[in-house]
Amino acid sequence: MALNAGFPTTGFDASQGLLAQARRRHPEVNFECRLLPGLDGVMNASFTNVLCETVIMHLPDAEVGPSVARMLSLLIPTGTLFLSWRVTQGSDRRDDAGRLYVAFDGSAVMTALAGAEVLLDEEVVSASSGKVVHRVNARVSGTV
């Protein structure tokens, strides 16, 4: 975990239930309820790195690009966005728990990353789930 490596860490989620679980497991981390794409109340250029792990595939298609653009805006110059999503083929679907998996075109992500330096763009099979996951790392241009 980033905190264990000495990095200040803040966690965001839209679900109060998931936030409660996270707070119990990691009481040393600041967790806040915030919604994509706005992340209202979070200052621009306030993070060195942003990790968004398998979240955006749960958003409505129209919110994917704006969410990625908003996450980029949170980064300081030369900050890095670490982004991944589970690849859903065909049409949108819900799993047994009711979670939405949107079958969106990754071009919305790449369009939102215009102006950033893409460091990694790959699809891999997740070791934990066996599902195909798309990973993108992008650095904001600029100087510190």
Predicted segment positions?
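Class I (Rossmann-like) S-adenosyl-L-methionine-dependent methyltransferase catalytic domain
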Residues: 1-43, 59-66, 70, 80-144
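Short catalytic micro-motifs in class I SAM-dependent methyltransferases
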Residues: 54-55
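Conserved acidic residues
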Residues: 48
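A conserved beta-strand element that flanks and buttresses the S-adenosyl-L-methionine
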Residues: 51
